[in-house]
Amino acid sequence: MGKYRFEEEEHVMFRKSLRKFLEKEAIPNYDQWEKDRLIPKSFWKKLGEMGFLSPQVEEQYGGLGLDFRYAVVIGEEMERVGASLTGVGLHNDITVPYIEAYGNEEQKQRWLPGCVSGDHITAIAMTEPGAGSDLANISTTAVRDGDNYIVNGQKTFITNGINSTLVLVVVKTDPKAEPKHRGISLLMVEEGTPGFTKGRKLDKVGLHAQDTSELYFEDCIVPAANLIGEENKGFTYLMEKLQQERLVVAMAAQVASEDMLEMTLDYVKSRKAFGKPIGSFQNSQFKLVEMATEIELGHSFLESLIEDHMAGKDIVSKVSMAKFWLTDTAKRISGECMQLHGGYGYMEEYKIARRYRDIPVAAIYAGSNEIMKTIIAKRMGL
């Protein structure tokens, strides 16, 4: 039986296969990746060889043509290993779908096979030093010059920024557009493009193995053939795809909560104080029961939400709810679980310490939780 009611036998087998792969290729190396502050490209290649990169891509472009249920399995199993594997989810479920949905035939043939094989690692560059949630006010510009665009600007906090070979860059192609969001376009910038440089690898509180960087564009010459979709339609494309991004973040937070509860249950059953397991104390029991209840509610909410998403329903309000509530819940659970671990929970050798520092950023990226509440309020007519 699968984890979700929509899982069939093939999804269960796929999960087992992926878990076995990760137990061999990721778990033994994860601590070293955290120290190196980078996941090697060789791991991406292995993912591609096994069919775990963008399996939803159509077979004619090298993919397996699988449905979103497989993406759920991959996302969950990556998070189960550690949150620093979030870059795989960004590649599979966030960036590559833009090429699939809005790219033309030539672009699909040029880029998708590499995205599936691991020869390409993708990133999406929205955030700037002066523009995060306020996406319409980005300052990176792209000016048409014959068969090219000349791009100038800076991006920051870019997931997969160091390893990336393809970066989907959000640019202003019409700075005078009113309202401002009507002047935004999407350009695919390839590694090695003149005028494109990668900045420093940012030193984050958590997600140490996940490469996050600044990107610079100085008179960067990007072929007009790299425009994704239509000029000045970029904001619309982003709004259409951000729902899946937020769903992916919510799923990862749910898995993190499940993982933290599981490790804490194991700990309180074996750790003794005053001659008996600390799990026998009423305070510990109440805390763990409360966590288990929230996690069960989160699972049911996600299950329904994933089904609605696959059915093509409008999930904007509900996915915003899931994103803010599940990430906030995971943050709270991380603190409770660390407390139940006592002093050992503050030691790096215990996984709860890593979870404690990795989870907070989930409430910030993919649209801050405050923005999620604003979206919900507007759709409630407030």
Each PLM stretch: what is its role?
Residues 66, 134-136, 160-165, 179-183, ...:
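Short glycine/proline-enriched turns and hinge-like loops at secondary-structure junctions
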Residues 137, 192-223:
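Flexible, small-/acidic-enriched active-site or ligand-binding loops
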Residues 88, 115, 130-133, 157-160, ...:
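Short Gly/Pro-enriched turn/cap motifs at secondary-structure boundaries
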Residues 118-126, 168-170:
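A short, Trp-centered hydrophobic/proline-enriched beta-strand micro-motif
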Residues 1-81, 85, 102-107, 114-119, ...:
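Alpha-helical interface subdomain recognition
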Residues 148, 152-198:
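A short core secondary-structure module
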Residues 215-237:
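Long, acidic (Asp/Glu-rich), low-complexity accessory segments flanking structured domains
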Residues 51, 74-79, 170-172, 188-194, ...:
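Short Ser/Thr-interspersed hydrophobic loop/turn segments at strand-loop and sheet-helix junctions
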